[in-house]
Amino acid sequence: MDIKAYFELIRLKNCLTASFGAFIGGLIASYFNLATVYDLILASIVVFLVCGFGNALNDIYDLKIDKINKPERPIPSKRLSLTDARVFSYLLVFVGLFISLFNMACFLMAVLNSIVLQQYASTYKKNKIIGNLIVAYLTGSVFIFGGIAVGNIDVTIMLFLCALFAMWSREIIKDYEDIEGDIQEKVISIPIKCGEKSVYIAAFLLVFAVFLSPLPYLFGFFGIYYMLSVVFCDLLFLIGIYNLVKNPSKKEAKKASRNIKIVTNLVLIAFLIGSLFK
């Protein structure tokens, strides 16, 4: 058994990042109540397994394309058979859903996200207009999942919304950067439909995320330390997207995409600061 191939199939780093997001989301929602750690560990394991299921499905459905573009991937390289990959993916989701029964609300969300992952892999990868929103939703949903695990989703809903709109913006920018390849692959995307105007759509979504970011302070969940931290992040967001709008080149799109990814992580730190120093 090639264990490394299984880790590659599920994209181990992505799974660890997602599970860490759920754990951090729960810590924020519980204001670092250590009594919730056991539930957060279970929630993180569920996210890891369901994320692995989704990533494995992507490789299963992308087999034809990967034979040409990524022949080193576990299935096209024959380090894993298609049958083994299928069995493993459904084992992951079965175990993940079983563990999620520790909390019925977590179970229902895990079922929902598993269905969304299956639909994305089978139907919406080539329709990025819908696919981008799905990716953004899945990215942000890990924070809500952590909040559900500890019984408080108020703050994590706001974190979810900020992450959703920031990641949605980033996905459109990435598509703008990859427009030629997507045309060859007959993919539907906002940049293919709208051209340079898609940069303005991405900018609008990111500005909306910035607009939402003060809500935890305004609603009294967090104090001034959060506000100061998130204003710094918002300025970085706005500078990056302004540079792209001013110069909508592929080079600037790459910079803007990287900037959003980095600053979104800084926003997560701002939420941590807000939770710690309320």
From Swiss-Prot:
* One BP annotation, GO: glycerophospholipid biosynthetic process
Q: Which cofactor does it need?
A: Mg(2+)
The main place the protein resides is membrane
The EC class name is: transferase
One GO cellular-component annotation of the UniProt record comes to: plasma membrane
Provide the reaction this enzyme catalyses.
sn-3-O-(geranylgeranyl)glycerol 1-phosphate + (2E,6E,10E)-geranylgeranyl diphosphate = 2,3-bis-O-(geranylgeranyl)-sn-glycerol 1-phosphate + diphosphate
For this protein, the record's InterPro entries field holds: DGGGP_synth, Prenyltransferase_related, UbiA_prenyltransferase, UbiA_sf
Intracellular or extracellular location(s): Cell membrane
Pathway(s) where this gene product acts: Membrane lipid metabolism; glycerophospholipid metabolism
**Which keywords does this chain's UniProt record carry?**
Cell membrane, Lipid biosynthesis, Lipid metabolism, Magnesium, Membrane, Phospholipid biosynthesis, Phospholipid metabolism, Transferase, Transmembrane, Transmembrane helix
GO molecular function terms noted in the UniProt entry? geranylgeranylglycerol-phosphate geranylgeranyltransferase activity; magnesium ion binding
Q: What is its EC number?
A: 2.5.1.42
Q: Topology relative to the membrane, per the entry? A: Multi-pass membrane protein
UniProt family annotation: Belongs to the UbiA prenyltransferase family. DGGGP synthase subfamily.
General function of this protein: Prenyltransferase that catalyzes the transfer of the geranylgeranyl moiety of geranylgeranyl diphosphate (GGPP) to the C2 hydroxyl of (S)-3-O-geranylgeranylglyceryl phosphate (GGGP). This reaction is the second ether-bond-formation step in the biosynthesis of archaeal membrane lipids.
> Which PANTHER family does the protein's record reference?
CHLOROPHYLL SYNTHASE (PTHR42723), CHLOROPHYLL SYNTHASE, CHLOROPLASTIC (PTHR42723:SF1)
- The name under which this protein is listed is Digeranylgeranylglyceryl phosphate synthase
